């Protein structure tokens, strides 16, 4: 696929999703059955309306059955499924119904709350529609078929995805909102995080714990002793995930994270990638200065490369109450961020250090334990 975007001055090639792969392979199968000739490429319309020419391999066919595969090409976006083969088997039937299912390497939903029903193959609605339309268009209205999508590497590749968090077990998902993979785009990642959040809400949860990643997750479970069932990753997308909790009408949010990550939010930085915004030292220096810290401490903190290193200086100087001040600012900024949209969301914050453990909370820790057990 020769289509490109530019990001930070560099040129990146776009690719296509597992859903587009499955639609192309399914269409190739139908064409081989109907023409009794091998098909090496097919033209498909993606879920987003883009027309692509997709190469096909591993072709086999007989009078009523065919198999074909398409290799996932994520362009310059090397994700967990890049380069793997998506196989499709199509068998004509005596009915007019077209039935789609997943086989080996395609995950199955085991929990409510996502866009796939419990027990069904993890083929999301948009690619499912696209696959069925591709087959129906080639097959016509008066024939039926059974379609099986499978991926021999799927179970292993799924270990590098968020599927287990979503209750999808046994393989990958067939995905694709637009059918096109856009390199350097965070949209797919954000969508996965939203899906997990939506699943929790659909299960009846009204309060949620947002963590930036594994450190936060581990701290919540093993230091605070809170249930893992309430935890969802927000990664670097703090603002986006806060907006999502509001959209889904969660009543309470507890943000738990390493101080070096969450300190940015106190200054209104809601996307916390270091490449986008790294003002940790500046924020610490400003808050220490407001507390009357001596110039010598401010100068030393400014030189620190990490908040862990700064923490040692802050502790020695007796200014650890700066953590409480900043935690309250994280809470205030976050609530202000959601202020002009309903419903309102109550937000609390817990920050910690790898070396020093719990640093600050916006509510007494025993009260938080009562609320979140």
From Swiss-Prot:
Q: What one GO molecular function would you report for this record?
A: cobalt-precorrin-5B C1-methyltransferase activity
Q: Which Gene3D superfamilies match?
A: CbiD-like
The domain of life is Bacteria
EC class:
transferase
Show the catalytic activity.
Answer: Co-precorrin-5B + S-adenosyl-L-methionine = Co-precorrin-6A + S-adenosyl-L-homocysteine
The answer to keyword Ion transport applying to this record is: no
Is-annotated flag, keyword Ligase? no
Pathway note: Cofactor biosynthesis; adenosylcobalamin biosynthesis; cob(II)yrinate a,c-diamide from sirohydrochlorin (anaerobic route): step 6/10
Which keywords belong to this entry?
Cobalamin biosynthesis, Methyltransferase, S-adenosyl-L-methionine, Transferase
Look up the record and give one Gene Ontology term from the biological process aspect: anaerobic cobalamin biosynthetic process
- Please state the Enzyme Commission number of this protein: 2.1.1.195
NCBIfam families registered for this protein in UniProt: cbiD
Family under the similarity heading: Belongs to the CbiD family.
The name under which this protein is listed is Cobalt-precorrin-5B C(1)-methyltransferase
Organism field:
Listeria welshimeri serovar 6b (strain ATCC 35897 / DSM 20650 / CCUG 15529 / CIP 8149 / NCTC 11857 / SLCC 5334 / V8)
Please name the gene that encodes this protein.
Answer: cbiD
């Amino acid at each position: 696929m020769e289509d490109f975007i530019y990001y930070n001055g560099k040129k990146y090639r776009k690719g296509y999703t597992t859903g587009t792969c499955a639609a192309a392979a399914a269409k190739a199968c139908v064409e081989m059955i109907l023409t009794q000739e091998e098909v090496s490429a097919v033209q498909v319309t993606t879920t987003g309306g883009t027309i692509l020419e997709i190469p096909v391999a591993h072709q086999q066919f007989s009078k009523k059955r065919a198999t074909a595969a398409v290799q996932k090409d994520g362009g310059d976006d090397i994700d967990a499924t890049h380069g793997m083969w998506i196989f499709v088997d199509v068998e004509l039937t005596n009915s007019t119904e077209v039935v789609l299912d997943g086989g080996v390497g395609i995950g199955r939903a085991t929990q409510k709350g996502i866009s796939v029903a419990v027990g069904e193959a993890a083929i999301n609605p948009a690619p499912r529609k696209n696959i069925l339309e591709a087959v129906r268009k080639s097959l016509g209205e008066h024939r039926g078929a059974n379609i099986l999508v499978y991926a021999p590497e799927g179970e292993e590749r799924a270990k590098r995805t968020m599927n287990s968090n979503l209750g999808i077990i046994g393989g990958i998902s067939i995905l694709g909102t637009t059918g096109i993979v856009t390199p350097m785009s965070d949209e797919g990642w954000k969508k996965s995080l939203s899906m997990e959040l939506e699943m929790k809400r659909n299960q009846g949860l009204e309060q949620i714990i947002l963590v930036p990643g594994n450190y936060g997750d581990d701290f919540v479970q093993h230091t605070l002793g809170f249930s893992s069932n309430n935890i969802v990753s927000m990664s670097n997308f703090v603002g986006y995930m806060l907006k999502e909790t509001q959209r889904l009408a969660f009543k309470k949010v507890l943000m738990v994270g390493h101080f070096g990550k969450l300190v940015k939010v106190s200054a209104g930085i809601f996307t916390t990638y270091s490449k986008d915004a790294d003002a940790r030292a500046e924020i610490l220096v400003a808050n220490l200065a407001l507390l009357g810290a001596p110039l010598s401490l401010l100068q030393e903190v400014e030189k620190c490369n990490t908040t862990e290193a700064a923490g040692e200086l802050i502790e020695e100087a007796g200014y650890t109450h700066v953590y409480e001040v900043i935690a309250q600012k994280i809470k205030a900024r976050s609530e202000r961020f959601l202020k002009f949209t309903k419903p309102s969301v109550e937000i609390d914050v817990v920050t910690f250090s790898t070396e020093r453990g719990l640093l600050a909370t916006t509510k007494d820790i025993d009260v938080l334990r009562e609320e979140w057990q």
